[in-house]
Amino acid sequence: MFHVSFRYIFGIPPLILVLLPVASSDCDISGKDGGAYQNVLMVNIDDLDNMINFDSNCLNNEPNFFKKHSCDDNKEASFLNRASRKLRQFLKMNISDDFKLHLSTVSQGTLTLLNCTSKGKGRKPPSLSEAQPTKNLEENKSSKEQKKQNDLCFLKILLQKIKTCWNKILRGIKEH
Amino acid sequence: MTLLSIALGTLFYLLQAVSGESGYAENDFDDAELDDYSFSCYSQLEVDGLQHLLTCMFDDSDINSTNLEFEICGALLDVDCLNFNKLQERYFLKTKKFLLIGDSKICVKLEKKNMTCRKVNIVKIVKPEAPFDVRVVYREGANDFVVTFNTSHLQKKYVKVLIHEVAYRQEKNENNWMRVNLTSTKLTLLQRKLQPNAMYEIKVRSIPYANYFEGFWSEWSPSFHFRTPETNGTGETDPVLLTISILSFFSVALMVTLACVLWKKRIKPIIWPSLPDHKKTLEQLCKKPKKNLNVSFNPESFLDCQIHKVDGIQAKDEAEGFLQDPLPPQPEESDKQRFRAGMQGPSWPSEQAGITPKIFRGESPFRCLAGNASVCDAPGLLSSRSPNGREGGKSRPLVYQDLLLGPGTTNSSLPPPFPFQPGILTLNPVAQGQPILTSLGSSQEEAYVTMSSFYQNQ
């Protein structure tokens, strides 16, 4: 009896708790009329674009992040989920408070709208370095400004991808 | 060991129960105290750059809010909760950290204990800033008033589209406000819809256009006062227009007067010429008979005349004999007169220099004395002495069916016979009749009678 109680107390409930997030990882996109995206997210994305344009002189190489993650059909919510989490990485950059505010709004606003139940606690958040493998060759000789420039370029592309994916979602909702 | 496992299991389940969704705090305080702490809030976005303002206050102004605090949790950036600041009886929070997506929870706390909470959405309780700089300009040419105002939301990024309400009234009518809704910042009021020479008050307020952002009416803008002109433009009539209108009036009056005066004599005959009346025309052409003129055809009235029956053939021979005699030349005027007298209708035989008398044998009971044709002037006969003698040269409509010319006619002009009375012969002295024959001969050339000649003789 001791073994039975021990198993039921310490075995099954944690197992249930661990398995539930894996079983239910769906995202339910709220705000399906697009009001939140058009009136809040798009405003902040455009502000970020305007702020980045002052500094950027980007290369045309597509980072690896987008080769691994794209806004394919039926994977739009997953892509936005990953992209929004990626935006958080840029908060660590040496940028202005308003820039951080816009980044936080886009990131957290997207996650709120996606309303994904998968929290992904066991996953390591992707770092900025993974997105640009070519940077490994350039880090030896690049200055902090060059690194920042590259990050901004990546951010610019990321924002455009997020915007495109949102438009695709809303267009699909209107067609249905 | 058993006790340890039981304690850990109990603790485990208690942790689960506590960490689970407990619902809103207000459900735990579903008692009379909830009504005491009822409150209302409104938000104002981008009041200072990127900072927003959230203001809350108790509905009951008598409440003792000494130790009461407000807290908002949820839908915030990078933080879980934020506390309000208190200013007199109002609680406000000025921050950039509103996510503007999703619901938040605002709670009233008393010594860190939630007294009441309410779920709110910041974007649904937006109260715009009041419009300002209201101006009214009168346009004299257009007879209207242009109302313009300004709002700070034109430069904002979130709440950009608003509905503005313009309210105006005549100052003596305190509660009779006229209201107009519009989305732009310019309004036109027609002068004819306002009272002249009156003082008006006008003000504006705004509300978010119900798209994503919703909320409440803003405060009224400061009022603007203006006065309408004294009259509706009558006192400032264009002098040129006034002059033209007066001249037009008098011109029309003059034309109407002239039309009435000249209607019968000049206008009507041109517009509606009357058809000639043959009887009247003849009467006019011929002399009017004297009142005491005996025009009866009663044979007894011709007792003074010598009546001779005329043999038709003999008369014809005699007429031909007269016509063959050469006639002396006469002055042109007399020629013309006699020419007019001798004009004939188209039915005359052209080979006749004279006129073939047409005598009914035995039917004409009488005839006038030869040479005394003037006695037998029939009334209404055409005469060269007619009033229109000057005009008769062209188309004097003289129709003769019978004319016997012979010597012995007087010097006077030929009295023509009555056109439709065959059998009446008039004689004219040859000496003076030569021009008559000439005129008769030449009259054939231009002999035609038209109805218009009748008309002219009128």
Swiss-Prot record, chain A:
A Gene Ontology cellular component where this protein is annotated is: extracellular space
Q: Which gene encodes it?
A: IL7
Protein family: Belongs to the IL-7/IL-9 family.
Name of the protein described by the UniProt record: Interleukin-7
In the UniProt record, the signal sequence range is 1-25
Q: Which UniProt keywords apply?
A: Cytokine, Disulfide bond, Glycoprotein, Growth factor, Secreted, Signal
Phosphoprotein among keywords: no
What organism does the record attribute this protein to? Answer: Bos taurus
Q: Which GO-annotated molecular functions does the record name?
A: cytokine activity; growth factor activity; interleukin-7 receptor binding
Q: Which residues are glycosylated?
A: N94, N115, N140
* Annotated compartments: Secreted
Lineage, top ranks: Eukaryota, Metazoa, Chordata, Craniata, Vertebrata
| Subunit and interaction comment | Interacts with IL7R and CSF2RG.
**Location of region: Disordered:** 118-143
Keyword Disulfide bond included in the entry's annotation: yes
Known function: Hematopoietic cytokine that plays an essential role in the development, expansion, and survival of naive and memory T-cells and B-cells thereby regulating the number of mature lymphocytes and maintaining lymphoid homeostasis. Mechanistically, exerts its biological effects through a receptor composed of IL7RA subunit and the cytokine receptor common subunit gamma/CSF2RG.
